[in-house]
């Protein structure tokens, strides 16, 4: 029998870009381990529209 898969795909979206009012969105798709990280994921990723690294948070 195979084990249940605990790694799930999540979408992370830029918080600074959302508040800036500019058009478009900066989103990434990544995976996380539900067992080790039950809370929402927060990573610093590159935003090509703002041309810098910004904080991206997990969305539902």
UniProtKB/Swiss-Prot annotation:
GO cellular component: cytoplasm; ribonucleoprotein complex; ribosome
Keywords attached to this entry: Ribonucleoprotein, Ribosomal protein
Gene Ontology MF annotations: structural constituent of ribosome
Source organism per UniProt: Karelsulcia muelleri (strain GWSS) (Sulcia muelleri)
GO process terms (BP): translation
The protein's name: Large ribosomal subunit protein bL33
Organism superkingdom: Bacteria
NCBIfam families: PRK00504.1, PRK00595.1, rpmG_bact
The keyword Phosphoprotein appears for this protein: no
Similarity annotation: Belongs to the bacterial ribosomal protein bL33 family.
Family annotation (HAMAP family): Ribosomal_bL33
